[in-house]
Amino acid sequence: MQFSKMHGLGNDFMVVDAVTQNVYFSPELIRRLADRHLGIGFDQLLIVEPPYDPDLDFHYRIFNADGSEVAQCGNGARCFARFVRLKGLTNKNEIRVSTQSGRMVLSITQDELVCVNMGEPNFEPQQIPFRANKAENIYLMRAAEQTVMCGVVSMGNPHCVLQVDNVKTAAVETLGPVLESHERFPERVNVGFMEVVHREHIRLRVYERGAGETQACGSGACAAVAVGIQQASLAEKVRVDLPGGSLHIAWKGPGHPLYMTGPATHVYDGFIHL
């Protein structure tokens, strides 16, 4: 099976063309391939499938390193767009794809960055899903023997965002796994730790559901900005600094889609016998 290794700001992926190849991945196989000592090593596996709708170009599937399938990955979406162009699967600059959670439009910019229309952030608890009586800008939760304040949103996948004074010293390793599997998130959650530098600049670390802390999380950056705008602490255009680099997020508010722009890097092509 042929594959490519790619990354978006250090969030790394194994990308597989299932348009021209017949492939099947069991959770056990994914876990073996994700192992950085015994396999390829990656945060997520991305699979390019033929479209299910004639109006679309491809279907986009995402699997975490633990073998679980998820509905969204923003950094992966940028790598997906770069991959299908590099492999000659399309020559379009605007690529329309379906995911488990809906549809996305991926646009290649003139300077070879990828702009992703991530759709409109969803703050409705039942659709995140998050156990709450009603939608709030800020929720109080008990975790790791303390009370934390957070915003909760879906970007096609669930996110919990905490504002911290200093992202370098944030309790990512202790609070991250506790909140990820908190009972109020029936499908678990990605946990973002956001430091607001000013209204157009934040620093962010993300503990990803099923993957742990990663170098960058695209949907997490989108979620942090959406929550920051909802809480009136951020402007419409924000630079997000992650451990692996920077993304640019733009959102005009409710009723509008959110856009994420950033790089996608091809590392190497490989072949593995399964």
Swiss-Prot record:
Q: Where is this site: Important for dimerization?
A: Y268
- Protein location: Cytoplasm
UniProt superkingdom:
Bacteria
Biological or metabolic pathway of the protein? Amino-acid biosynthesis; L-lysine biosynthesis via DAP pathway; DL-2,6-diaminopimelate from LL-2,6-diaminopimelate: step 1/1
One matching Pfam family, short form? Answer: DAP_epimerase
GO MF annotation: an example: diaminopimelate epimerase activity
Concerning InterPro entries, the annotation shows: DAP_epimerase_AS (IPR018510), DAP_epimerase_DapF (IPR001653)
User: Which reaction equations make up its catalytic activity?
Assistant: (2S,6S)-2,6-diaminopimelate = meso-2,6-diaminopimelate
**GO-annotated biological processes:** lysine biosynthetic process via diaminopimelate
Ordered alphabetically, the record's keywords are:
Amino-acid biosynthesis, Cytoplasm, Isomerase, Lysine biosynthesis
Q: Where is this site: Could be important to modulate the pK values of the two catalytic cysteine residues?
A: H159, E208
Q: Which residues form a coiled coil?
A: none
Q: What is its EC number?
A: 5.1.1.7
Residues the record lists as binding substrate: N11, Q44, N64, G74, N75, N157, N190, E208, R209, G218, S219
- Main localization of the protein described in the UniProt heading: cytoplasm
- Active site, renumbered: C73, C217
Give any Gene Ontology cellular component.
cytosol
Role noted for this protein: Catalyzes the stereoinversion of LL-2,6-diaminopimelate (L,L-DAP) to meso-diaminopimelate (meso-DAP), a precursor of L-lysine and an essential component of the bacterial peptidoglycan.
Q: What is known about its subunit structure?
A: Homodimer.
- State the family named in the UniProt similarity comment for this chain: Belongs to the diaminopimelate epimerase family.
Q: Which PANTHER family match?
A: DIAMINOPIMELATE EPIMERASE, DIAMINOPIMELATE EPIMERASE, CHLOROPLASTIC
Q: What protein is this chain from?
A: Diaminopimelate epimerase
